[in-house]
Amino acid sequence: CIRDRTSQVDERVRGKELPDDVFQESLEYILAHEIGHCLGLMHNMAASDAFPVDSLRSATFTQRYGTTPSIMDYARFNYVAQPEDGITQLTPKIGTYDKHAINWGYRWLDVQDPHEELPTLNAWLREHENDPEYWYGEQSREGIDPRSQSEDLSNDAVLASTYGLKNLRRIIPHVTDWTSEEGKLQYEGGRLLMAIVFQWLAYADHVKTNV
């Protein structure tokens, strides 16, 4: 899924094989996500709704914050980024929500009875209840809450998907150039083309859930 979402801005993923540095960047994100599960964190599909589209097109913003306030979201790659944006940070980072959730769950409070922790814990929640970077949205197949979607970005599904479609149109003419090997079957090209089709469907689904 990395090629169909980022090859419009990242030349490293256009070849027939992904280079080691791309694997390392992806592995760092995956490991952080899975360690979050080991620490008790659930998927937080609402996190990416906290960031506006314009921020995801900012090189300085994405370099600092990534694509979502939570590594537990499925906001794997910045498909909003356009070639002229100069963005190099295309993957998520450990964010505001993650640090807050770990602090809430693991911070030692010097009390004898666990129930004595509740006033402090509840106060921490109330302190940030109106800040979308601290919101939680569970994973759901029904699409009841359009903020909590898998593989989406930003708080504007229509605009984000529009940018995503623009990028797919940029990638399609190069499918053969970027994947073919002389004298061999076009297996990688076929895989990339199918990934593009499924990504198009994902963009449409993100918008449909808002209707």
Language model features with spans:
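A solvent-exposed, charged loop/short amphipathic helix patch at secondary-structure junctions
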Residues: 6-9
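Active-site recognition of the HExxH zinc-binding catalytic motif
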Residues: 29-44
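Conserved catalytic/binding loops enriched for acidic/polar residues
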Residues: 48-211
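Conserved small/polar residues in nucleotide/adenosyl-binding loops
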Residues: 1-4
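Short pre-active-site segment immediately N-terminal to the catalytic Zn-binding motif
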Residues: 11-31
